[in-house]
Design a protein with these regions (language model features):
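Conserved catalytic/acceptor-binding region of the Class I
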Residues: 27-95
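Core SAM-dependent methyltransferase catalytic element
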Residues: 76-79, 96, 145-157
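Amphipathic alpha-helical interaction segments
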Residues: 67-71, 127, 147
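A short glycine-rich, Lys/Arg-flanked "PGG" loop and its adjoining helix->strand segment in the class I
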Residues: 12-27
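C-terminal helical/coil "lid" or tail adjacent to the Rossmann-like core of SAM-dependent
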Residues: 82-143
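A short SAM/SAH-binding and catalytic strip from SAM-dependent methyltransferases
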Residues: 1-12
Length: 157
């Protein structure tokens, strides 16, 4: 199986290689997020837009690969057997108790990524994190992200 194909420069080549090495009748499972489905509300439209844009571009990699898994498997010659999608929602989070919503990245690591990709000035890092933490304390924090999964089979020989 594969997860995090979005971190690859060419996800279609990776899936094609999986199809090449799986035996006839064998299966490949693929699961990944699709950052184009990412939604965030922190009571500040400017910060929300900055976060959405950063997550969707993901350092120039194909961050929307999740929704494309079915097509990638099909184009690699695999026969899709099953597909599913699930949306994770984060709403309740106390930044004074944990650095990140359960099962999610921390806002500090997000800010570090934004600085590393020149989408946030280093001098703005603390203010950015503070605004998101303040929104969470006011119960104005919510995020959603959809993951996609595909199981595909190599046709029998």
């Amino acid at each position: 199986g594969a997860h995090d194909t979005r971190h690859l420069a060419d996800p279609s080549a990776a899936v094609a290689e999986m199809a090449r090495v799986v035996r006839p009748g064998g299966r490949v499972s693929l699961i990944d997020t699709d950052w184009s489905t990412f939604a965030i509300d922190v009571g500040d439209d400017e910060i929300a837009a900055m976060v959405r844009n950063a997550m969707r571009t993901e350092r120039g990699r194909p961050s929307n690969v999740g929704r494309r898994l079915h097509d990638l498997a099909h184009h690699a010659g695999l026969a899709p057997v099953a597909r599913a999608e699930a949306t994770q929602t984060w709403t309740r989070w106390n930044p004074d108790e944990t650095p990140a919503p359960d099962g999610c990245f921390s806002m500090q690591s997000l800010a570090d990524d934004l600085v590393a990709t020149d989408q946030l000035a280093p001098a703005e890092r603390d203010r950015f994190v503070s605004k998101i933490h303040q929104a969470a304390r006011r119960d104005q924090f919510s995020m959603q992200l959809t993951m996609y999964a595909v199981v595909a089979a190599q046709p029998p020989a």
